[in-house]
């Protein structure tokens, strides 16, 4: 299920702006049709506590589906704090975390992965164009 609206906003706000309010039950039903039939990847927009439907957050959808989540954080200054806050939020909602991915947009010399691994036992993967084959190999081990 892919929802596209003209307004660049949260899915909740965009759906209200378009006159087609999006309800959590609609998202759950669209996703559950696929669960058990094949590999299911559900991409949220924003973070764990970002609105995704009328009066619903990404965390509500994740909890309803019961699928493991992947936390993706831009690999930059502040990434460790952002990742740890997201991990804490997911844990408080009793969501299963498959891994954290540090997504490197621009080459950097930060040691965010090493720092993050010191604070969590959750697998931490690093993605960059230069390391894409290694990333895929590590990700396949988790699936």
Regions flagged by a language model, labelled:
Residues 87-143:
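C-terminal lobe/tail of nucleotide-utilizing enzymes
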Residues 53-60, 84-87, 110-114:
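Charged helix-capping and loop-helix junction motifs
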Residues 11-52, 59:
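Phosphate-binding/switch loop-helix module in NTP-utilizing enzymes
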Residues 73-81, 85-88:
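Active-site beta-alpha connecting loops in nucleotide-dependent enzymes
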Residues 41-43, 70-72, 101:
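Structural motif
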Residues 53-75:
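Inter-motif core of Ras-like GTPase G domains
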Residues 1-3:
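Short, small-residue-biased leader/transition segments that mark boundaries at the very start
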Residues 45-46, 76, 105, 128:
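Anionic group-transfer/hydrolysis microenvironments
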């Amino acid at each position: 299920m892919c929802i596209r609206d003209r307004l660049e906003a949260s899915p909740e706000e965009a759906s209200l702006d378009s006159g087609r309010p999006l309800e959590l039950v609609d998202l759950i039903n669209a996703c559950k049709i696929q669960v058990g039939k094949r590999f299911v990847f559900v991409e949220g927009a924003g973070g764990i506590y970002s609105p995704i439907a009328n009066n619903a957050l990404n965390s509500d959808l994740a909890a309803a589906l019961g699928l493991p989540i992947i936390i993706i954080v831009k690999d930059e200054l502040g990434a460790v704090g952002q990742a740890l806050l997201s991990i804490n939020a997911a844990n408080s909602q009793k969501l299963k975390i498959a891994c954290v991915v540090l997504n490197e947009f621009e080459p950097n010399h930060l040691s965010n992965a090493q720092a993050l691994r010191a604070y969590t036992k959750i697998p931490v993967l690093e993605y960059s164009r230069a390391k894409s084959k290694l990333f895929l190999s590590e990700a396949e081990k988790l699936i």
